Structure formats: C-alpha cells, structure tokens
C-alpha cells in the first residue's frame, strides 16, 4: 500500500547559503547524483545534482547552532559568520519515488530555516570528505548566485528560488 504523505510530518532542517568575499555561493554536487551520460541523454546541461549545505536540527538544538554545525560537517568550513536568517520556514515535499526511502523513511519532506553566512577563510579550509560524518558531496565550487538554480535538485528548486530572492539583496562582495 503506498504511503500517504499527508499523514507524515516534515523534518525540521536548516539550510545554509555560504558566500565568499567575492559574493559567490558555495554549492556541492550530491553523492549519488545521476551520472553525466544519463544527464546528457536527458538533455540536461549539468553534471549532477548540486545543492547548498543543509541538515537536520538535533533535539533541543538552536537552528543557528545547527546551521554552523551542518556547514562544518558537510564542507569543513569553520571561518564563517551568520549574516542573516530567513524570515520564515520553507518547506518542500519529497517526490513519490523517494517517499519512505530517505530521511529515515518517516518524513514527507523538510521544513527549513535558512541562514546566509559569509565565509572569510581560504578555500584550503574546505574539506568535503569528513572523518566523523557521512560524505554528502563529491565535488564543490563557488558559483554566481544567478547560476545556482539551474543545477539544483529539481524537487528543491521552488525553495531555492524563494531563499535566493530573500537573500539576494545581502549577497554582495565584501
């Protein structure tokens, strides 16, 4: 019997838009992204699904602390400061083929509080192969804000559009 997503909760989560001194946004290619050949055959002009760091909020954890923790766990970045927090929580639903298979199989999607952080360290600080955390990304790069949406995991694009619109005025070279 198929799962009924309307009976499932959203997972509390934080998302992080990390920008560097040049105002570029950090994005990582998801481990397990579709391979390049499959994407080319589908007509896509990208080499996998990319996204910004994000992750679950631990029990009794403050979302700001969760954002800094997730950034460090997934990217190795430690030299970053919070510039802004989203004005609201954004939600997305998982596509039917992932429902019951990801997020512990018990969530319909995620409810996310987003944070804009400025990375002031050097790129050598970035390490996507963590020792104490599952690897989320197999590649990373800094991208212009206007290029980010085209490469985002499709079911997250609506949230990304809204987050980018909210943070755009603050994404300036520093």
Where are the predicted features?
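N-terminal strand-loop-strand
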Residues: 2-52
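Residue-level marker of positions within ordered structural domains that often coincide
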Residues: 21, 120, 165
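Generic alpha-helical hydrophobic packing signal
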Residues: 24, 67, 71, 80, ...
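Functional cleft and adjacent loop/helix regions within the main domain
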Residues: 32, 49, 98-104, 145, ...
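Short, glycine/charged-enriched secondary-structure capping and boundary segments
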Residues: 32-33, 41-43, 97-98, 130, ...
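Unchanged
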Residues: 55-154
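Charged phosphate-binding loop/patch that engages nucleotide di/tri-phosphates or the phosphate backbone
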Residues: 145-174
């Amino acid at each position: 019997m198929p799962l009924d997503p309307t009976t499932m909760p959203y997972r509390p989560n934080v998302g992080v838009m990390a920008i560097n001194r040049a105002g570029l946004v950090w994005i990582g290619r998801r481990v397990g992204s579709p391979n390049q050949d499959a994407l080319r055959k589908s007509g896509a002009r990208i080499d996998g699904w990319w996204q910004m760091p994000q992750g679950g909020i631990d029990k009794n954890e403050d979302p700001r602390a969760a954002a800094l923790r997730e950034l460090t766990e997934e990217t190795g970045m430690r030299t970053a400061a919070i510039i802004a927090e989203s004005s609201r929580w954004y939600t997305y639903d998982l596509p039917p083929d992932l429902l019951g298979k990801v997020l512990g199989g018990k969530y319909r999607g995620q409810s996310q509080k987003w944070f804009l952080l400025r990375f002031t360290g050097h790129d050598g600080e970035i390490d996507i192969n963590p020792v104490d955390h599952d690897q989320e990304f197999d590649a990373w790069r800094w991208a212009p804000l206007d290029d980010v949406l085209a490469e985002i995991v499709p079911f997250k694009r609506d949230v990304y559009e809204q987050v980018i619109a909210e943070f755009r005025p603050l994404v300036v070279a520093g």
